[in-house]
Amino acid sequence: MHSFKILALACAITAGTAATAQAQEVVNLYSARHYATDEALYNNFTKATGIKINRVDSDDAGIVARLKAEGAASPADVVLMVDAARLYRGEKDNLFLPIRSAKLEEVIPANLRAQPEADGGITWFGLSTRARVIAYNKAKVNAEDVDSYEKLADPKNKGKICIRSASHPYNLSLFGAVTEHIGEAKAQQWLQGVKDNLARPPKGGDTDQIKAVAAGECDIAVTNSYYFARLMRSSNPDDVAVANKVSVVFPNQSSWGTHLNIAGGAVAKYSKNKDNAVKFLEYLASPEAQTYFANGNNEWPAAKNVQTDNPALKAMTQDKPFKSETIPISAVGSNMAKVQQMLDRAGFQ
């Protein structure tokens, strides 16, 4: 059973005109985003619109479980998740309400949102992006030996790689993207090669992998970009020292581009405040909110033509654009079942 931290949620909506009127001035949010800067976003939205945000925090899996358990009685209006595959699963489990929003459809690229329904409705939209990058010990590894995901399986990297659990959503999404690019047969061989190159059994989170590289426990790690940026911007000198010992590469610049995952949002299927929910998602795609995502949590905007000024992200990319993959992010979710089967066959935990 997943535990929830309830911050200000009305657990039941009573019948009656007064209650209905009051409900129209709130958005009940189920969020897997646990970032301090997001609180400022919610406050700004309330100041601008008068619509109060009542938030429940959990992880993606906990939100899905709660929505399923609550069914039509759910008070949720908006769902925020931090993984494309989980958003795809929520869509297929019929937990979200397809919507039409000219604002969202204009600014969020088609490959960073759900495929449209027959009537044009879209069930979820990416709101920020994060790259799955390769970190490496610059004193021991040449950048050209880790400049693609495929090279993680190269025998020359045997015994060098640290990675969190293969079944973690961030890795599942990467593996789903690689499968989409190279096909299931080659992806199976690749996964086996990556497993064979591990320096230790998978453990810990992404930051732990970066620190393991800095400590010499391994030479190569796979991580989301914002974890490295956090170390670079940390007020803790030890964190900065870790970042200074490690370099990152944005893989596959000469082929399909670096894999991007998303944090995204959807209107809950049984939303009692649909109009407010859509307004909130539109606000999260606005330049103001997109800049918060980039500068506050070291993510890249999902919306088009938003300028940001994050020194860590600039340093990571050498202040140049990087090539990212352009496959529909929904394709990553559709590959999850076969990816799990491939991991089982490889014994990659």
Q: Which residue stretches match the model-derived regions?
A:
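Ligand-binding pocket segment of bilobal, Venus flytrap-like solute-binding proteins
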Residues: 166, 170-173, 177-251
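A structural signal for short loop-to-beta-strand junctions that line the ligand-binding cleft
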Residues: 74-79, 97-134, 150, 161
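Early extracytoplasmic/lumenal segment of secretory-pathway proteins
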Residues: 23-89, 349
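Extracellular/periplasmic bilobal clamshell ligand-binding domains
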Residues: 309-349
